[in-house]
Structures are given as structure tokens and as C-alpha cells.
């Protein structure tokens, strides 16, 4: 009887140990997102392989088309990625005159063009991923008491700008010239010493302050930002990439030149097919030389992240966005611009890129007219996204 009790206790102890061990295995499998012991073993093998991945540091804005990279839903194949949220001025400065601590980084398209053409910069190569694009008609602000009703009325006027050669300002001058016939030399430019949006944009790189020959350009008073100049009447209008303080605060004599800028910008796209590009993605060339597969892997990851954004917009944007008519906005955008209205790749963006190359050269900013083939890594020339 005593032996039977001992055996029963031993069996019970063994059973408990087995159940405890099984629970531990199941818990570990759950953490790894697998549903079986065999899945756990496979995941463990995968984890051990991942130690051979390339560690890379990526920088960019926190924006919906990149969110899946930031939160880890999308990974760059073959890489262990660390994503750092940064502002464009700081990213530009890091690349052109700083420590180049980012292996992959969002970059201002026009500052990169100027660094490449004018300064012989070759530290990074761009890939045809464009995290930020923006129609720019909305970015012209005026004093309402200066008789400015249309772009042609800017002739002879004083127009303030924070900086001069940023991507946004280069697009703006080009659009005003080619769509409305007002050349940069017909305007009196005043560069403000401060920018009311500097906290959001970060420190401007030197490539954003290139002043060409042959224009009427003066510096605004020290200590005054662009909004001070517009509010005081020292200038008649303002070109600004963001929303200037004077407009945000509702100054009674400050307005947009195009009050219905949505219609104006939609008409511009219908006419030209151009969705202006502001930022691209660039990769350090020494990293590419050692890992020639990386440009394609980065392109694919950004494309996958954008696909998740599209899917969210179609299904759930009305939940996560505070705009009450967001669903109609999405539908109308797709009707005008297509399902993939934010395209990556060279083919879909060739016209927009070459238009900015033209604007930069004819405005006296880039020392020569650049080409797509020299600015973008050769391995990315024919990369295409999966169909939306």
C-alpha cells in the first residue's frame, strides 16, 4: 500500500512538471506569434539567423505612409532597423555637413540636387521613394490691402521668403513663372532672418539658402520672421512652405492668394499630371557598396508601408482621422489621381523630377541641369511597386 502511494505521488509530480513545461513552451510560442512547438522551433531558428542581419539606422518624419516602418509592422528585408523620427532640416544637415549618422534617411530633394551639382556631394544616393509631396499653390500668402488678386499681380511686389532655395520655394517660383508668366526677376525678394515654423522644420541646411545672381534680393531686419514682415506691411506677400504664424493666428489683413486652393491645385494636376515632390529617400553609398541588395530592399519596405496606408484609408480612415468628410476626400482623390495617387518609382515620377531639375537650373540655383540617371542609384532605375 505504501509503495502504491509513493508511485502515485511520483506520477502526479511528473504530470505536474510536464504540464508546467508545456505551459512554458506555449507561452513562449505565443510571444513569438506561433501556434505550435514546431512553430516555436522554426521561430527560434529564424531568430538565430536574424543575428546576421545588417543593422541600419533610418530617419524620417512620422507620417502615415511610413508609420508601418516606424512601428515595426514592416521590416526592411535582411536588416535590423532602428527608426529615428527627425525633422527635415536636421536630416539635411546631418547628411550634408554633419556626422552622416543615418544609413537611410529622408532628404530634401532640392537640397540634395544642389549639394550634388554645386558641391560635388557623393556621400548618399537617392532611391525613388518620395515620403513628402505637396501641391504648392496654397503656400502663397498676401496682404489683402495691396491689390493682389491673382499671381500676375505679384509683379513688382515685395515677397518675403524664409530662406530661398528650399524645394518648396523652388517649386513655387517655377509654378508662378510657368503657369502665370511671372519670372523671379520681376519680384523684389526679401529673405527673413527668422522662420516662424523653424521648430517644426529643424535647422535649415546651407543648400536652402543659395541666392542666385541677377535677382533683386535683400535681407529682412534682424530678429524679424516672415510673419512680422507681412504683418507690418514691410512686404506685400509671402511664399512659405508651412503655415506662417501670421496666417495661423488669423491676422485680419493676411490671406491666401488662392482662396479655393483645392480647386486650383486639382486643376493644376489635371493639366500637368504633376504632384510636386518635396522629399526623397537616400542611402549612404558606402553601405550600398558593401550591400548592393539594400536599395531594392529599402524601396520594397517603403512601398509595403504605403500599401498598408492605402488599405487603412480605404477601410478605417473615418475612425482614426478627425475630418468628418475624409471618406469623400479619399474617393475624389482616387478618382482624379488614380488608385496609387502617391507613386514611387522612376517611371511614374519622371515628369515631376525633370520639371524640378528645369526650374532649379533656369532659376540659377543648380550649376547645370541634372538628370535622373545621375541622382538615383542605378539599381533602382526599373524598380516597380506591386499593383494597388
Model feature map: region roles:
Residues 17-40:
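N-terminal export signals
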Residues 11, 34-59:
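C-terminal segment of N-terminal export signals and the immediately downstream linker at the start
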Residues 282, 287-362:
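Secondary-structure end/capping motifs
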Residues 1-17:
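N-terminal secretory signal peptides
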Residues 47-51, 55-198:
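Short, glycine-/small- and polar/acidic-enriched structural segments
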Residues 197-314:
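Pocket-lining segment of extracytoplasmic ligand-binding domains
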Residues 84-95, 187-228, 374-381:
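Short helix-initiation/N-cap motifs at beta->coil->alpha
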Residues 345-388:
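Long, low-complexity C-terminal extensions of enzymes
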Amino acid at each position: 500500500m505504501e509503495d502504491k502511494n509513493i508511485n502515485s505521488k511520483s506520477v502526479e509530480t511528473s504530470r505536474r512538471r510536464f504540464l508546467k513545461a508545456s505551459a512554458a513552451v506555449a507561452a513562449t510560442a505565443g510571444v513569438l506569434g506561433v501556434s505550435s512547438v514546431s512553430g516555436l522551433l522554426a521561430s527560434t531558428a529564424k531568430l538565430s539567423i536574424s543575428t546576421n542581419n545588417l543593422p541600419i539606422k533610418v530617419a524620417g518624419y512620422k507620417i502615415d505612409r511610413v508609420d508601418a516602418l516606424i512601428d515595426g509592422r514592416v521590416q526592411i528585408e535582411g536588416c535590423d532597423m532602428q527608426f529615428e523620427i527627425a525633422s527635415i532640416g536636421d536630416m539635411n544637415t546631418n547628411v550634408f555637413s554633419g556626422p552622416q549618422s543615418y544609413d537611410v534617411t529622408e532628404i530634401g530633394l532640392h537640397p540634395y540636387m544642389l549639394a550634388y551639382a554645386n558641391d560635388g556631394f557623393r556621400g548618399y544616393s537617392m532611391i525613388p521613394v518620395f515620403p513628402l509631396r505637396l501641391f504648392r499653390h496654397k503656400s502663397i500668402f498676401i496682404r489683402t490691402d495691396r491689390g493682389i488678386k491673382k499671381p500676375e499681380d505679384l509683379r513688382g511686389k515685395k515677397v518675403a521668403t524664409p530662406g530661398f532655395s528650399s524645394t518648396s520655394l523652388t517649386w513655387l517660383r517655377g509654378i508662378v513663372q510657368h503657369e502665370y508668366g511671372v519670372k523671379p526677376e520681376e519680384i523684389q525678394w526679401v529673405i527673413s532672418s527668422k522662420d516662424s515654423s523653424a521648430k517644426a522644420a529643424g535647422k535649415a541646411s546651407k543648400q536652402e539658402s543659395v541666392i542666385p545672381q541677377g535677382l533683386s534680393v535683400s535681407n529682412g531686419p534682424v530678429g524679424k520672421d516672415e510673419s512680422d514682415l507681412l504683418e507690418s506691411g514691410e512686404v506685400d506677400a509671402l511664399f512659405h512652405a508651412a503655415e506662417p504664424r501670421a496666417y495661423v493666428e488669423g491676422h485680419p489683413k493676411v490671406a491666401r492668394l488662392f482662396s479655393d486652393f483645392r480647386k486650383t491645385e486639382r486643376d493644376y494636376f489635371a493639366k500637368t499630371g504633376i504632384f510636386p515632390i518635396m522629399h526623397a529617400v537616400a542611402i549612404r553609398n558606402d553601405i550600398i557598396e558593401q550591400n548592393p541588395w539594400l536599395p531594392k530592399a529599402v524601396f520594397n519596405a517603403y512601398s509595403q508601408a504605403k500599401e498598408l496606408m492605402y488599405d487603412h484609408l480605404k477601410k478605417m480612415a473615418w475612425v482614426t482621422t478627425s475630418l468628418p468628410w475624409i471618406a469623400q476626400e479619399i474617393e475624389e482623390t482616387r478618382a482624379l489621381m488614380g488608385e496609387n495617387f502617391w507613386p514611387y518609382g522612376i517611371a511614374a515620377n519622371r515628369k515631376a523630377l525633370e520639371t524640378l531639375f528645369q526650374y532649379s537650373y533656369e532659376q540659377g540655383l543648380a550649376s547645370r541641369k541634372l538628370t535622373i540617371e545621375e541622382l538615383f542609384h542605378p539599381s533602382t532605375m526599373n524598380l516597380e511597386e506591386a499593383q494597388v
